[in-house]
Amino acid sequence: KADEAVKVASDAGQIVEKVLVWRRYPDAYQSEVPMKPGRDFFMDEYLPEFSGVRVDPVQLDADAALFLMYTSGTTGKPKGCQHSIGGYLTYVAGTSKYVQDIHPEDVYWCMADIGWITGHSYIVYGPLALAATSVMYEGVPTFPDAGRPWRIAERLGVNIFHTAPTTVRMLRKYGPEAPQKYNFEFKHMTTVGEPIEPEVWRWYYDVIGKGKAAIVDTWWQTETGGFLCSTMPAIHAMKPGSAGPAMPGIHPVIYDEDGNTVAEGSGIAGNICIQNPWPGGFQ
């Protein structure tokens, strides 16, 4: 796909000078697309040069760009969202600490794709800013079998777990036997990315959390940088299948299609709008 991506970029006026190619096994290049000398480089050949090397940080303005991430495109053409350094990092560190209860001594595992905003905010920047151990894995949760997540949790001593309802549903199909084979204990679990049905929530709580772990059901978007709505552990009561209230400092309102406020408790669907700025919002 690299040649296609380079052509698309070139047609848009962006010249790609170098392409880094990752080989799973050194000296084993299996793609049918030939490497282009001078443009394509095997990443594994250069990694040893930087192993153990300390890279001094570069001082930048708080409002300087940190990354550009595109939305999923589920509701239209993907849109590029640019996040800043200072505001974004402040928000994901704060929400990681107060919503997910992450501390330096914790071993935290978010099973999201690192290329998704959840992966950026809650695999990389949030937990690492708090000096916690952040687990990363490759592949899918059910290969070679459905016990894989729980083996990893047992082996690494994971005590905070973060995943999406789709993954919980998939693992639930295999029954409680797989997780019951392994010795792990989560103090806290997060659900993110979509609504979770009450019966799926209860399985997550009873089987994976063993009836002990606090669950936070979060709502947010690529554009928001971090959680906007969620219960707070030990403060709010958990409600199966329901995302929590607005985060501290976040003031949402529901509007109908004509811009009128939807009354609380009316049962009418509307559009969520946030009435105030917050540090994690995209630029």
Question: What annotation goes with each model-predicted range?
Answer:
Residues 47, 132, 159-163, 172-240, ...:
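Gly/Ser/Thr-rich phosphate-binding loop
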Residues 16-27, 35-70, 77, 87, ...:
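Conserved pre-ATP/AMP-binding loop-to-beta segment of ANL
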Residues 245-249, 260-283:
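Conserved ATP/PPi-binding loop(s) of AMP-dependent carboxylate-activating enzymes
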Residues 65, 71-74, 96, 108, ...:
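Conserved S/T- and glycine-rich ATP-binding loop of Class I adenylate-forming
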Residues 2, 154, 161, 278-280:
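AMP-binding/adenylate-forming catalytic core of the ANL superfamily
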Residues 89-107, 117-159, 173-176:
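Conserved AMP-binding/adenylation subdomain of ANL enzymes
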Residues 1-5, 80-82, 133-141, 170, ...:
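Short beta-strand->loop structural element characteristic of the AMP-binding/adenylate-forming
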Residues 57-60, 237-246, 263:
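Short Gly/Pro-enriched turn/cap motifs at secondary-structure boundaries
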